[in-house]
Regions:
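Radical SAM enzyme [4Fe-4S]-AdoMet core and its adjacent flexible, acidic
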Residues: 85-177
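Glycine-rich phosphate-binding "P-loop"
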Residues: 1
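Radical SAM/AdoMet-radical enzyme domain recognition
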Residues: 6-125
Length: 177
């Protein structure tokens, strides 16, 4: 069960926990998690079975300004401090934009490996739809390029470790490290 963090309401989580829903995932940019440690404590009451899906496009504010039009590096760091403190399962979610943040894949993986709450990193290639207007086709990155860059920028994986998912091998791949 997934819902956007902006719509967060403890009643939703309480109702979901009463049902046969084993895993709750909250999508967030991390702002509230960074600003309100007590709020993170309240979220921790829903463990196990709660996961934070944290927008995490870069470690660099200059890059974040290009992608999100906001300086979010310190926000993300504070959010992760709070999530680490309460050991809330977290996935970092990186929208990859070719020639903007694709050179930081290795840095993001290394950073994630140092966070006790982080259970995974999801790299999502830029989708040219909706609000995306400042990027073009030259900023699209393919799954093959992502796999290659992971291996080039980090010693955590080899190409053999990152395997295409059979149900959609052109769009999905996974690796465990």
């Amino acid at each position: 069960f997934v819902f956007p963090f902006e719509k967060y309401d403890q009643k939703i989580l309480k109702e979901a926990k009463k049902r046969p829903i084993r895993h709750l995932m909250i999508n967030t940019n991390g702002i509230k998690l960074a600003q309100d440690k007590d709020f993170v404590r309240q979220l921790a009451e829903f463990k196990p079975g709660l996961e934070i899906y944290l927008q995490f496009d870069s470690l660099d504010d200059d890059v974040l300004l290009q992608i999100r039009a906001a300086k979010l590096a310190e926000i993300h760091n504070r959010a992760l401090e709070n999530l680490n403190y309460y050991d809330i399962s977290t996935t970092l979610v990186t929208t990859l934009v070719k020639n903007v943040n694709d050179h930081q894949i290795g840095d993001i993986l290394e950073f994630a490996a140092k966070q006790s709450c982080v259970r995974g990193v999801t790299f999502q290639p830029l989708e040219l739809a909706g609000r995306v207007s400042s990027f073009g086709l030259e900023n699209r990155i393919t799954l093959s390029e992502v796999r290659r860059k992971i291996c080039e920028q980090s010693n955590l994986f080899t190409l053999q470790d990152i395997i295409p998912v059979p149900c959609n091998p052109d769009a999905l791949a996974m690796g465990y490290g």
